[in-house]
């Protein structure tokens, strides 16, 4: 299992290089399953908007699959190298993933060796718990189960600055999880959690 987690994924040059350097092959050769955030619509999926966005990071268009929350079954058994979930509202994106059954599929993919790239919301979703994110993502989209996918057994404080130090310290004090802070230019690799 390999997770590459960051605050800004490809939106920050340092993070983008870190991600590319930690893939199993050149980014242009990787087959990726991209998960849009909570603002997704069926029309946006069909428009090619998401393929263009992901291609701008170096993936080849013919290697990009965009997860369709409205028709998920064709995406459950793909031959892919990477799963990529970027930023947005953590709760809204996780709700879409759960409601469509992709939560189990993502865990299965990662357990079979597919690399997970998570940026901001996507990074939080990979963790054990997202409840602390409600301070930053105000709309929880009606979620009552705040467990993440559990790929990483700890939790993250993304977009870490001195403004979030008190939150980081409080989470550490509680001692429920390992807590890692990530500034916008930072990324981490987690293997075999």
Model regions and ranges:
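N-terminal beta1-alpha1 cap of cysteine-dependent amidohydrolase-like domains
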Residues: 1-82
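Short, flexible loop segments at the rims of nucleotide/cofactor-binding pockets, characterized by
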Residues: 8-12, 61-65, 93-96, 135, ...
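Active-site-adjacent pocket-lining segments in enzyme domains
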Residues: 85-86, 94-115, 122-193
């Amino acid at each position: 299992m390999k997770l590459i987690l960051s605050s800004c994924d490809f939106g920050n040059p340092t993070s983008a290089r870190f991600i590319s350097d930690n893939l199993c092959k050149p980014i242009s050769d990787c087959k990726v399953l991209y998960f849009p955030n909570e603002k997704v619509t069926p029309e946006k999926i069909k428009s090619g908007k998401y393929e263009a966005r992901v291609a701008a990071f170096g993936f080849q268009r013919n290697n990009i699959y965009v997860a369709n929350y409205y028709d998920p079954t064709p995406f459950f058994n793909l031959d892919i190298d990477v799963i990529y979930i970027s930023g947005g509202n953590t709760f809204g994106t996780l709700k879409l993933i759960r409601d469509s059954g992709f939560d189990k599929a993502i865990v299965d993919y990662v357990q079979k060796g597919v690399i997970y790239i998570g940026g901001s919301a996507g990074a939080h979703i990979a963790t054990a718990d997202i409840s602390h994110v409600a301070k930053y993502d105000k709309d929880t989209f009606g979620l009552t189960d705040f467990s993440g996918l559990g790929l990483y057994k700890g939790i993250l404080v993304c977009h870490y600055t001195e403004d979030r130090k008190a939150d980081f310290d409080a989470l550490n004090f509680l001692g429920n999880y390992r807590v890692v802070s990530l500034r916008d230019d930072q990324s981490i690799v987690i293997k075999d959690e």
